[in-house]
Amino acid sequence: RLNDLLKAITQHYIDRGYVTSRAYLPQQDLADGELDVIVVEGRLEGVEGSAIASDRELALASPAQTGEPLNLRELEQLVEQINRLPSRPAELELVPGSDVGGSRVQLKGEPGKPWRVGFNRHNDGQRSTGEQQWGASLEWDSPLGLADQLSLRAGGDAVSDRWRHSANQSFAYSLPYGWWSFSYAYSQSYYRMRTQGQGFPFVSDGESKTHQLRADRVLHRDSISKTGLSLGLAHLETRNYIENALLGSSSPRITETQLGFNHGRRLGSAFVNLDLGWQQGIGALDAKNSRIDGKSGTNARYDKYSLTASYLQPFQLLGENLSFDSLINYQRSEDELNSPQRISIGGLSSVRGFKDQSLSGNSGGYWRNQLRWTRPVDWAPLQPFVRQYGLAFAYDLGQIQGDRNNARSHGRLSGNALEFSARGPNLAVSLTFARSLERPDVIERQEHPIYARIDLFY
């Protein structure tokens, strides 16, 4: 019974991450009817990063403190912060320390190239602003030696003319600090398109700029789950023109606060993730007044609520590797939102099967489902270029609720798709054949889009 008691006490510590703590019975006289149990709380004597991380990077990324009881959850957080850099595949190893119950942590792994460049070409653009699109990216791990990350991206239409053009650029930077992660992102975009009015063509163009600050905090983690909270502040400025005349009613300046909750969990071999969000428009940073446009009634002091839930289940059938994934994205607002805050469905990233036609509204959502089969390439001459190929079948559906600004443009969309894909060390290609199924009357025609994409990366 005493052994069972000691095991229970030790297990209590282990379940909370104190894997080097142990309970034992010292020599004692039980004549007084009291039992003394001593717990040796294993201490952390230090963390060694070797080539995978410098001392400065470890100091920022690790919530664990030397001399404190060793907690595996803190060390898992450290490894996760380092592993978020693709060039730092770190693994954890505990080695005995110099003191009784003490342990040292060694991070094992070989660092890779700290930067990555990528180029892509696809046809997922809009016909009005350029269907054929290109993109380029640069990622740099730990540019300041702080386990930080820098990302630069740019893209645009591959064929421009007087009537059609689009371009976009973005910058992102993230910095870890123990249980926290801080990030800043900036993006800007420009479009030019042809519009028709009273039988005459006009040039319509516009630009948008977005700044976002965000802080993420891990609240709890154990061997199968992680829970976190995020706080953010975003500022968006949009300017739209017709023949160089500013359209004030559709050119808002919006500032919003963001509060998010995240919970991820492993269920057997499956993975489940839940994100809840609340966004509120405020008047800071020169945001416009509550009523931006008296005609449309769009509101810059809005409240918007969002939910995203995902499920991934890998499995094998008859010796083949398969996976099923499902994602639900939903938002709701009782306020009239400007276009950037509204939810849109119809396209490769929401309801496949639609490309030139879509629905948007204050409230709505979509549900994506996909069954994927993958197989490694066995033919040796092809392996330097392609390591894996696969096939996926998808079925998506979405719903937009009616509101003041879309009395007709609401309803339900659904579509399916068949995707062929291949991937190698420096190459990824995909070809997707999609078909629209359900659509409301406002969506005038059925679509059969074909999405093609090629990515080169180094």
PLM regions with names:
Residues G67, H122-D124, D157-V159, Q196-V203, ...:
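Extracellular loop and loop/strand-boundary signature of outer-membrane beta-barrel proteins
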Residues W115-V117, L144-L150, G178-Y184, D222-T227, ...:
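Repeated loop/turn-to-beta-strand initiation elements of outer-membrane beta-barrel proteins
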Residues L138, L213, A309, F420-L427, ...:
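Outer-membrane beta-barrel "beta-signal"
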Residues G109, W140-S142, L175, R217-L219, ...:
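Residue-level signature of outer-membrane beta-barrel architecture
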Residues G101, G130-W134, H165-Q169, E207-H211, ...:
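Residues that define the transmembrane beta-barrel architecture of outer-membrane proteins
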Residues L94, F119-N123, L150-G156, F171, ...:
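Transmembrane beta-barrel strands of outer-membrane/channel proteins
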Residues R239-L397, Q401, E444:
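C-terminal outer-membrane beta-barrel translocator/porin domains of Gram-negative envelope proteins
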Residues R1-G125, G155-A167, L327-I328:
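Periplasmic polypeptide-binding modules associated with outer-membrane biogenesis and secretion
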